[in-house]
């Protein structure tokens, strides 16, 4: 299928400045105790930007591995298991664990799912060309709320598997 896309105005800029909602800080207490404890410590000892850097350091120090066939995570404390036990996953795993960690640290955060990449197909004389986006281009990342910038994109998969993001 082919879909058309049109863009205009300043709607995206305004949308990025919409303040966070309570859901952007929601973290089920006790659901992932190790992650919750780390985030809680950062919330009381680090300013928001330093919490992002601490998360980057945690992700890179854990020796996480990108794979499309990760081990099954347990029903209890799955994000703790991902970061401290199985240490393998794909973009949705890394984005959700980073987002939960930021929320536990008091930084509003959300997961964004979309596409990264695609292949430009030039015009063939009948049209104007198009971007061919396939399932393999699907990707998940996070956004965090940082004053005064608003929502800022953070892609924890880039810390784990930079070649996946290139």
Please place each PLM-identified region on the residue numbering:
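Acidic low-complexity segments
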Residues: 1-85
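Conserved structured core elements
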Residues: 49, 85-88, 92, 96
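Solvent-exposed loop/turn segments at secondary-structure junctions
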Residues: 10-13, 59-65, 73, 89-90, ...
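Short, contiguous acidic/charged loop-to-helix segments that flank catalytic cores in large enzymes
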Residues: 81-90, 129-133
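Charged, low-complexity, helix-prone segments enriched in Lys/Glu/Asp/Gln
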Residues: 39, 165-166
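Surface-exposed beta-strand edges and their flanking turn/coil or helix-capping segments
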Residues: 16-20, 124, 166
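Hydrophobic/aromatic-rich core segments of domains that either
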Residues: 93-165
